[in-house]
């Protein structure tokens, strides 16, 4: 969908832009495919202590139950609607299967209302179909990729995300992920063909701080604006430098270039090249 800009009437609309909804995108979900969600604490743990900073507030949302497994094998489904989902950057599709089931899936780019999709090992190589990696040709663009067989897609699910199948060898498939990481995944795991829709989601401009607060994101305060008790960069008279060779986090760790991934993880052997 194209990015829509506002006519300048107030300061907050001067630089604000949103994803343009056309007649195809609906806003009201089907009630049976939604559930309530309670954001307890907004970044706090069970004791009320902040464990994830810059979270809080936000508009109340209904969770749309998305089918990431795509395990309706050999049962064709028709795309009935394309809908907005406040819980993710991508749009979602409502699918009516021939056996009567109704489910939401991620909207693949190029899929239109009335199109038919299929899942299973014998599904054709077509956008929106889900099948195991072993049945896909090399160079296929995919999204919603499983890491563990049967668990459902976990990789390449954001708006505009797409991965590439670049090799298959010894019951493993080599994928190039959107982050630039190259890793091995079992070729029995399934994925959906195509790219996730709403590719212009990153081009929008919020225009004001309140638009971020609607999403449950609080402002980030600079360390030099804090007191010494709150941040290693804090304190001093006036515009004082941080007093260190390199910037650090609030807990004293290096803030630039330090790898934060834990060592000796079980998945290290599957990663052939780190992300860029």
UniProtKB/Swiss-Prot annotation:
Spell out the subcellular localization from the entry.
Plastid, Chloroplast
Listed GO MF terms: rRNA binding; structural constituent of ribosome; transferase activity
**Top-level taxon of the source organism:** Eukaryota
A GO-annotated cellular component: chloroplast
Keywords in alphabetical order, please: Chloroplast, Plastid, Ribonucleoprotein, Ribosomal protein
* A Pfam short name: Ribosomal_L2
Taking the first listed entry, what is the main subcellular location of this protein, grouped into a coarse class? plastid
User: Where is the segment annotated Disordered?
Assistant: 225-276
User: What Gene Ontology terms for biological process does this UniProt record contain?
Assistant: mitochondrial translation
Q: Which Gene3D superfamilies match?
A: 2.30.30.30, Nucleic acid-binding proteins, Ribosomal protein L2, domain 3
To which protein family does this belong? Belongs to the universal ribosomal protein uL2 family.
Subunit note: Part of the 50S ribosomal subunit.
**Protein's recorded name:** Large ribosomal subunit protein uL2c
Please report the organism this UniProt entry assigns to the protein.
Pinus thunbergii
């Amino acid at each position: 969908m194209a990015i829509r800009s506002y006519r300048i009437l107030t300061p907050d609309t001067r630089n604000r832009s949103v994803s343009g909804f056309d007649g195809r995108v609906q806003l009201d979900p089907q009630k049976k495919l939604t559930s309530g969600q309670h954001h307890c604490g907004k970044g706090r743990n069970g004791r009320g202590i902040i464990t994830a900073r810059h979270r809080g507030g936000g508009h109340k949302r209904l969770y749309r139950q998305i089918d990431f497994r795509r395990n309706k094998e050999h049962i064709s489904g028709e795309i009935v609607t394309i809908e907005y989902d406040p819980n993710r950057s991508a749009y979602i599709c409502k699918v009516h299967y021939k056996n009567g089931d109704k489910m939401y899936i991620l909207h693949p780019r190029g899929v239109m209302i009335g199109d038919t999709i299929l899942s299973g090992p014998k599904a054709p190589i077509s956008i929106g179909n889900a099948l195991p990696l072993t049945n896909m040709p090399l160079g296929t663009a995919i999204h919603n990729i499983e890491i563990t067989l049967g668990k459902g897609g976990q990789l390449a699910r954001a708006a505009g995300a797409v991965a590439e199948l670049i090799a298959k060898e010894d019951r493993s498939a080599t994928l190039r992920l959107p982050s630039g990481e190259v890793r091995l995944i079992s070729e029995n795991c399934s994925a959906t063909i195509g790219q996730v829709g709403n590719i212009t989601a990153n081009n929008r401009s919020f225009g004001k701080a309140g638009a971020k607060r609607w999403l449950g994101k609080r402002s980030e305060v600079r360390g030099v604006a804090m007191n010494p008790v709150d941040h290693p960069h804090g304190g001093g008279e006036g515009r004082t430098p941080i007093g260190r060779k390199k910037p650090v986090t609030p807990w004293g760790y290096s803030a630039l270039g330090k790898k934060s991934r834990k060592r000796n993880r079980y998945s290290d052997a599957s990663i052939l090249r780190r992300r860029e």
